[in-house]
Amino acid sequence: MGLPSQVLACAILGLLYQHASGGLIKRIIRQKRETGLNVTLPEDNQPVVFNHVYNIKLPVGSLCSVDLDTASGDADLKAEIEPVKNYEEHTVNEGNQIVFTHRINIPRRACGCAAAPDIKDLLSRLEELEGLVSSLREQCASGAGCCPNSQTAEGRLDTAPYCSGHGNYSTEICGCVCEPGWKGPNCSEPACPRNCLNRGLCVRGKCICEEGFTGEDCSQAACPSDCNDQGKCVDGVCVCFEGYTGPDCGEELCPHGCGIHGRCVGGRCVCHEGFTGEDCNEPLCPNNCHNRGRCVDNECVCDEGYTGEDCGELICPNDCFDRGRCINGTCFCEEGYTGEDCGELTCPNNCNGNGRCENGLCVCHEGFVGDDCSQKRCPKDCNNRGHCVDGRCVCHEGYLGEDCGELRCPNDCHNRGRCINGQCVCDEGFIGEDCGELRCPNDCHNRGRCVNGQCECHEGFIGEDCGELRCPNDCNSHGRCVNGQCVCDEGYTGEDCGELRCPNDCHNRGRCVEGRCVCDNGFMGEDCGELSCPNDCHQHGRCVDGRCVCHEGFTGEDCRERSCPNDCNNVGRCVEGRCVCEEGYMGIDCSDVSPPTELTVTNVTDKTVNLEWKHENLVNEYLVTYVPTSSGGLDLQFTVPGNQTSATIHELEPGVEYFIRVFAILKNKKSIPVSARVATYLPAPEGLKFKSVRETSVQVEWDPLSISFDGWELVFRNMQKKDDNGDITSSLKRPETSYMQPGLAPGQQYNVSLHIVKNNTRGPGLSRVITTKLDAPSQIEAKDVTDTTALITWSKPLAEIEGIELTYGPKDVPGDRTTIDLSEDENQYSIGNLRPHTEYEVTLISRRGDMESDPAKEVFVTDLDAPRNLKRVSQTDNSITLEWKNSHANIDNYRIKFAPISGGDHTELTVPKGNQATTRATLTGLRPGTEYGIGVTAVRQDRESAPATINAGTDLDNPKDLEVSDPTETTLSLRWRRPVAKFDRYRLTYVSPSGKKNEMEIPVDSTSFILRGLDAGTEYTISLVAEKGRHKSKPTTIKGSTEEEPELGNLSVSETGWDGFQLTWTAADGAYENFVIQVQQSDNPEETWNITVPGGQHSVNVTGLKANTPYNVTLYGVIRGYRTKPLYVETTTGAHPEVGELTVSDITPESFNLSWTTTNGDFDAFTIEIIDSNRLLEPMEFNISGNSRTAHISGLSPSTDFIVYLYGISHGFRTQAISAAATTEAEPEVDNLLVSDATPDGFRLSWTADDGVFDSFVLKIRDTKRKSDPLELIVPGHERTHDITGLKEGTEYEIELYGVSSGRRSQPINSVATTVVGSPKGISFSDITENSATVSWTPPRSRVDSYRVSYVPITGGTPNVVTVDGSKTRTKLVKLVPGVDYNVNIISVKGFEESEPISGILKTALDSPSGLVVMNITDSEALATWQPAIAAVDNYIVSYSSEDEPEVTQMVSGNTVEYDLNGLRPATEYTLRVHAVKDAQKSETLSTQFTTGLDAPKDLSATEVQSETAVITWRPPRAPVTDYLLTYESIDGRVKEVILDPETTSYTLTELSPSTQYTVKLQALSRSMRSKMIQTVFTTTGLLYPYPKDCSQALLNGEVTSGLYTIYLNGDRTQPLQVFCDMAEDGGGWIVFLRRQNGKEDFYRNWKNYVAGFGDPKDEFWIGLENLHKISSQGQYELRVDLRDRGETAYAVYDKFSVGDAKTRYRLRVDGYSGTAGDSMTYHNGRSFSTFDKDNDSAITNCALSYKGAFWYKNCHRVNLMGRYGDNNHSQGVNWFHWKGHEYSIQFAEMKLRPSSFRNLEGRRKRA
C-alpha cells in the first residue's frame, strides 16, 4: 500500500502547492472510505493515470523465493473507467478526470503454494488495499467549491438535502452523490452502471447480463469456463498463466517439452517406444530390461535372479549345485537329486508318501516299515495270536483286539459288560455268564417277582424295588408316603391327607369348612384370632381389640359420624364435618375473627396521616397501632368504635416512615391485621453547583441542612434518553456535601437532581444541567508494521463526535508532523513512506463543534529491512554454504533458521554481518540426503526483519564400517552400518582377480548380505553404494577372500556281526556340517540306503543288515550343502544264532520249572509263551534275559494241560520256536457254609472240609452295599466254626470262605447274613414352645427305614403317632397343650422288624401374648397394645430400647393389654418387647419395632431480601435428617420445590420476581419420614427490569456472572426463554446463540433442528432460528464473533445485526464491521438460511450438503461456523476466511448479540 500512497501524495502536493500557506505541516482532507472500484472526479487537465506493478515477496511459510519484475500479459491490458457511483452535475467532462489504475498479478505457477494460508491472507490484504486506494477522492483543486459561481466561504452546512435516503449531499459538487443503483437529482431513480451497456436487464440497480457478457455493467466479454482459474479473461479471450494453454486454459503444458520422442498429455510427457525421462530424451535399454533391472548408460543392470542382455533369462538357485541343468530359471536335477537347487538326495520311491526323506534315507511314519516305507506294520506283531494282513491283525480263534492281545468272552457279554481275561464283568442291572439276564433292583426285597428286570410287587408294597409300604389312597397327592403312613403337606390332615386344615384350627372360635374358618360371632380374621368391631368401623377407623379407633374427622362407636375441628370453638355449627361460623368469625374451626380489608392512606402531611378501611361484618371496635419502621421507635395505639371505618393519626415526626396496622376486635378477640407503610414529607436541598467536569465524571457540591435525616440521593439523568434507563442514582451519607460522580458517558448532557432521604423516603429535589467532556479515541494500536508502512487502528470514542484529527511523525523530531482529518466513522488509517527502524508517535483527538477531547497517543517502531538475493553456493552430505546481499539498515547480525522440509525441530544460527556487500555462512551438522527450508533475517537488539528464504539439500552419505565375516569356500558374509540419509536401495559390486565384475541391488532395509557361488580360496574387491533416484553416495570398498576346502580320509570297518558292523574315518574338527554314508548289498545293488551323521562324529554303528551278506560302503562329507569326494570300503556280515532243547520239571497245581540249551550265537532275550491245550485261558508270555537258561512259571490253573513255546531274540531277530507239554495237579475243596445266632453286631459261621488237608481258612466279610471296608479273618485249619462280632446293626453282609494249603487257595464258597435292627439312644428335647417341641435321638449304628414316635399326656389321653424317615434323627411334635407333661416313645423300624423302644418326659412352655401393635406415634410418645395369652398369667413384662438409649423395663398386671410409652426421642427406631410371666415360667418374648416421628425445624425466617433473591435460614430439628424439602410459592400461585442437604441451615432463593410476596414452607425429611411444615412470608424488592428482554437488561439488574439466565421476549412475562449470557466479554450483556469448542455436538442437521435449536447451552449448541428472529426483532442489535485457536484470539463486531422471520427463510442482515478477525460476514449479508434439506443458497450446488453444515450460504461461504469440527479439508471445517482461511478448522467460535445502544459506558457503569 506504500507505493499508491506515495504517488497519491505527490500528485496532491503538486495540485495544492500554489494554494498552500507554508509551514512544515501539510493538512490532507480525507473523506469517508467507501468500497467499490476507482472513482473519477472532474479535473481541468488531462487524465492522470497511476499504473502500479507490485513486486510481491512471498512469506517464509510458502518456502518460495520468486521475484516478478513484471506481470506477464499486462502490457496488452487497457484500463477501463468503471465508476461505481453516479454524480448528478451541471457540467460533465469525462476527459477531465483523475484515474487510479492498479494491476496486481500473481501468476498461478509462480510457486506451488497458492493455497497456503499465508498466501490467502496476502490476497485478502491486497483486496483490502485495493478497496482503500479506490475509495480515495480529492476535493476540487481550488479552495472554492465546485458549484457554479461559488465563493470561498467559512462555516458549515447545518441542513443538507435528504437525497431520498439513497445518497449523501456533497458541497463540492453542490449535489447528491448517489449510492450504487440510484440516480437523479435526489437519487430517487433506480439505475444500473452505464445502463448495462444495452447488454443486459437492469433489475433493482443490478445488471443481469446476456450470455457472453459479464461484469457489473456487462462491459466485459465472458471467457469459456472462466479460464478455469488458470488464466485472466481479457476481452473474452483467456490469457493463460505460465504452464497452461488452450481456449479455456484447461490444458497443462509439459515443463520441459517432450522433444521429438514424445507428446504432452495432461502436463506429462507420454514417450515414444524406446525413450523415457521427463522430456523423453533418454533412450531405453533392450526390451526395457523386461522390467527386471535398471537401464544404466543404455545397458541393463539386472535385478537379482535375472541375467542376459535384456535381463530376459532367469538364474537358477545356486547354479543347481552342478547336479542338474538350468532351463529358464528352473533346475532339472540328475537322478538321485531333487529340490529347487538339486541340493537334496532322493529316497527310494519317495518313501511312498509314508515317511520323510532325510539325506536319501526314508524315516518311516508310525505303522510303516521297509527301505521305502511301503509295508504296513501290525500293532505288537499281533502278539503271535494272529497274522498281519495289510497292517491289520487277523486274530486266531478265541482272541480279539487290535493286536490280538485280548481273550474273547461268551457272546461278547451281549454288550452289557466288560470282558476281562475272558470273563464278563456285567454292567449294573445285568447278570449271567454272558450278561444276558436283566437284574431287578435289590432283588425286589423278596416282596415281589422279577420279570425282565422289573419288580412286580406284592399287595401293600410299592417302589422300583418293592422296598416301600403303600399309603391309603396314595395320600391323595397331598402328602408324602413314609413306611405306609401319610405325612401330610401343610394345610392338609387325615389318614390319607384328604381333609383341608384351617389356620391355627380357627383358635376354637369357629368352624373349619373346606380349609376356611367360619368364625363365631364377635370374632374375625383368617384364623378367627381377632375380635371384630361394630360395622367394621364403617371403613373410617381401625379395629383394635374389638373397639374402633376412628380416623381424624370421624367419631362414634362405629366411626360413622363426621366431627368438626375443635367443635367449632362454640361459635359455629357442625354440618357434615364442616363448621358454619357465626357472624364475625371465620376459619375451619371458627377460631379466627374476620379482619378488615383495603387499608388506604390519604392526606399525608409532615405530622398527620388519614386512614380508611373496609369491613363487611359488625365488630365491637377497631384497634389502630403505628410504629416507626426504624429500630427503637415507640409502638403507639388507639381504638376506633366498631361502626367507624376511618381514623386520623396525629403528632407524627416529619420525614419518618411508619408501619400502621388495623385489627378488628370481637368479644375481646383480635383478627389478623391489615397493614400499610407511610412516611411524612421532607424539605428540599439548596446550593447545588459543579466543581470539576471530566469525560466520565463530575464533581458536585451543595449546601448542608440542619434538620435530622438519613442521607442524600444524587440522580444523574441522561437528557438524550427518554426513559429512566439513563438514570444513575447515588446514595450518600448525611455529613457529605460533595460527591464525585463517575461512570458518565462522554459528551452527554445530564440533568442532575439532589434529594434528602430519611427512613428510605426521598424528599423533593433540586436540579441543574451539565455536559460532560468529549473522550478521545481509545485502544490505539499500530498493526501490520513493516519497514516503511503501518496500519493505525483505534476504538471509536463513546461520545457523538463530528471528526477525528490524526497526527504522526518521528518521536525524536517534534517539528516533523503530518496531520490527517478523518470522519467520525473511521477506526483505522494506513501510514506509508516511513523510515526503517524508526520510532514514531501517533496522536488522536476527537472534535464536535467547539469541543475537543484530550489527545490520545501511541508509539511504534518500524521494522528492519530483510536481506536480499539469498542463494546456495555449495553443499556436502552434512553442510550447506549460503550467500546473500546485506540489509540497508545498521544491524547487529543475521539469524539463520533452518529445518527439514519433511518436518522436525528447527535450528537457529547467528552470523555477523559481512564487511563487503554480501555475507556468507555455512550450515554444518546437517542430516545427509535431506532438503532443508532456510530463512535468513536481519537482527538488531531484540528486533528481527522479515526472512529471506530458500530450499537446499545435502548430499547422500555412504554406508559405514563395511566388513567381511564368516568366509567359507563358496560364500562371504558382509556387514555394514546404514547411511543416515533416506535412500531407495544399495548397489553392491564385487570383482574377482580375473577382472570379472558382478553387480546387484540390495533392499534399503538391509545391513548385511551373503555373496554366494564364489570360488574357494579367491580374493574379491567389494564396493557398496547408496542410491536415491539418480543420486548416489560415495562408494565404500573392502577386500575379502574365501576359504580352502578341508580334507577327508582313512575309512575302515570293525566289530562285524551277523546284522551289522562299525565304521570309522578321519576328518578335520568342525570342518563339516555332516557325513553321508551309503550302504549297498554287493550282490543286489537295489538294496541301498543312506545314513547321515553330524559333522563332529567320526564313527557310526551300522545295524539292521542281513546275515552272512557282502556290502559296499561309500562315505562323503557335506560343507554348507556342498559334498566332498567319496571314500569306499567293503565288508561281509556273520551267521544267525540258534536255540536247542526245552525241558519241564517240578510240576504243582499252579506252577512248574523250565530249562533249555542254545547251540550258536549270543542272545539279547528269550520269550516263553504258555497256552492251555483247550484254548480256554488267556495265553501267558514271559521275557527272560539272554543270559538265562532256566525259568519258574507260576499262577497256572490246577488240573490243566499246557503247551510251552520258547524262542530266542538277537538284535531284533527271532529264532525258530521250540516247545514242550505239561499238566498241573488238582486242588482240595471247602463246603456247607452256614449262618446262625444273629445279633445287632454279629452272627456265627460254620462249614465242612476234609481233615488235615488245609493249613488255615480265610474268611472275607463285607456289607452288600459296599459302604465299609471288608473284614478278613484267618482261622486255624482244625476249626470248623467262628463267631463274627463288631458289625453294623441291621446290615446285610456277603461272606466268602476258602482254605489255604501250602500257600495255595481252594475254590471259595459264599453266603449272605444280616444283623438285627438296633434301638435309638439318647432321647432329648429342644425348641420347646407352648404347643410344639422338637424331639431328637441318636440313631442306631445301622441305617433303618423309619422311626415311630408316639406321645401322650402323662395324665392320660389318646396318643399321637408320627412316622419319621430313617435318615432323620429329630422331628417336631405339634398340637401340644401349654404347660402339660408328655410321655414320648421312639422305635426303630427296618422292613418288618422293629427295635426295642426308648422313652422320655416333655414339659411344654407357656404361650406368649400376640398382636403387639404400636399406635398414636408422635415425635415423643406412643401407645403399645397387644392380645392376651390364652393361659392365665400373673404379669406382662414390657421393655423398650433404641440403639443409643438404655432399655426401659416395666411390669404390668396380667389383666392389662396396653401401655403408654413417654419421653421418646424423635426420629428414633425403638424395639418394643412383651412377654408373660407365671411363677417361674416365662413365655416367649413378643417384639416389634416402631419409629417416632420427625420433629420440625425451628425459627424459619427470610433475610437479605432483594429483587430476585432472598436468604432463608432456620435452626435444625433435634433428630438427624437426610434432607430438607423447601417449598416457596408466589402470591400468583407459582410453586417451586427444592431438596436440600441435611447440613444446610440456609438457602438462597434465586430467579424470584421483583415486588412479589412469597410464602416459604420447610419440612425435614429422614428417608421416608417427614416432619410437620413450618412457614414464613416475605416480599421481594423492586428491579430495574423485572422481566429482562435480553442479557443486557439482566446485567443492568446486577447479574455479573456468565451463565444460564431466563429472559422474557419483549419483556412479556408469558414468553420466557432460557439463554446463556456472556457477562464478561467487552462489557458483558451478550446473548450467546452459537458455540463450537470440542466437536461433541453434530451440527450437520436438518431444517427442523436449526429452526428449533439444539445442544447444551453450557457446551456446544445452537439457539434456534425462530428464537434468534424473536430476539433480534426486539430492537437494533449488534453482533460479536469471538474466535480462539491455540492461544491466538480474534474477534469481529458488526454494528447492525438481525434475522428475518420464517417467510424470509430467516434472512440475515449484517453491517458495520470492526475487529481483528477480518470482515467475512458481510459476504453473507441478505442471504436466507440453508440446510441440506432446505437449499436456499445462490450456488449451483447444495452448499450445506457439500460442506456438511448449515449457514446463510451464498456461493458458498466465507464463514462456516457450523462446519465439521476439526476437519481441515477445504471449506469443510469451522472456517472464518479472513482469519484462518478455508483450509483450517478453528478450535473455538462463539456468536453473540446485544442491543447496539448498550455500547455506551454509562449503562455499564450503572450496572456496577
UniProtKB/Swiss-Prot annotation:
Positions annotated as propeptide: 23-33
Tissue-by-tissue expression: Expressed in the brain.
Signal sequence, renumbered to the chain: 1-22
Domain Fibrinogen C-terminal, first and last residues per copy: 1582-1797
One cellular-component annotation, GO: extracellular space
Pfam family, one: EGF_TEN
Subunit annotation: Homohexamer; disulfide-linked. A homotrimer may be formed in the triple coiled-coil region and may be stabilized by disulfide rings at both ends. Two of such half-hexabrachions may be disulfide linked within the central globule. Interacts with CSPG5.
PANTHER family the UniProt entry points to: TENASCIN
Protein name: Tenascin
